[in-house]
């Protein structure tokens, strides 16, 4: 039986952060998921070191080179109604997917759902990054996201949750000479797709 959500996590040399990112997905309150870790030709052994006891986790070798090719490899294997993006150096709070799926279930006119973020770094987060975080977290409803879309991408890429049919119709991630996530969100907007963020995540 197909899972509700397929989480695609492309990674190249995920280092010490990968296991924590994986654990944060497998520890979601929404349990009906699969996690596809797509290995983009890693050399650091982090993918090999993952605990594979959870049957929801699948390691997939990328069919190309680069993050877009790796994500699209996972997208081709994904079985879920929704496709979530995750990065190897991020942590998803436990309610992320439950709240996002609930939001899209309640808002059938919205095709892409993001979430708020809290930036963190070993050396601390600088004031400019704090302002960027505040701007990201202030763009919540579809009207605000569309209004701000041509300033910068209001959907943080590793928080994105897509309706699988819409994402496939858009062709997944392209490989432009600029950020692949921003390119995808601009293509989604041009296609008339709406984007939003739920409260509380």
Mark where each language-model region is.
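A conserved acidic beta->alpha catalytic loop
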Residues: 24, 31, 39-48, 87
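Acidic helix N-cap motif at the loop->helix transition within catalytic regions
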Residues: 16-19, 44-52, 91, 95
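Conserved nucleotide-sugar donor-binding catalytic segment
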Residues: 7, 76, 115, 137-201
């Amino acid at each position: 039986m197909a899972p509700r959500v397929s989480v695609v996590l492309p990674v190249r040399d995920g280092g010490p952060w990968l296991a924590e990112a994986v654990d944060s997905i497998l520890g979601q309150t929404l349990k009906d998921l699969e996690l596809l870790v797509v290995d983009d030709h890693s050399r650091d052994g982090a993918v090999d070191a993952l605990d594979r006891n959870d049957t929801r986790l699948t390691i997939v070798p990328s069919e190309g080179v680069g993050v877009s090719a790796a994500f699209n490899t996972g997208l081709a294997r994904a079985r879920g109604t929704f496709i979530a993006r995750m990065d190897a150096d991020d942590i998803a709070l436990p309610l992320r997917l439950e709240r996002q799926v609930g939001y899209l279930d309640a808002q059938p006119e919205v095709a892409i759902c993001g979430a708020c973020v809290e930036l963190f770094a070993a050396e601390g987060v600088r004031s400019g990054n704090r302002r960027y975080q505040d701007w990201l977290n202030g763009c919540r409803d579809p009207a605000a996201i569309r209004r701000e879309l041509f300033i910068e991408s209001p959907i943080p890429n590793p928080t994105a949750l897509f309706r699988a049919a819409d994402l496939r119709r858009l062709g997944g991630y392209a490989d432009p000479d600029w950020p692949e996530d921003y390119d995808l969100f601009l293509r989604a907007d041009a296609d008339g797709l709406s984007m939003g963020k739920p409260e509380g995540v």
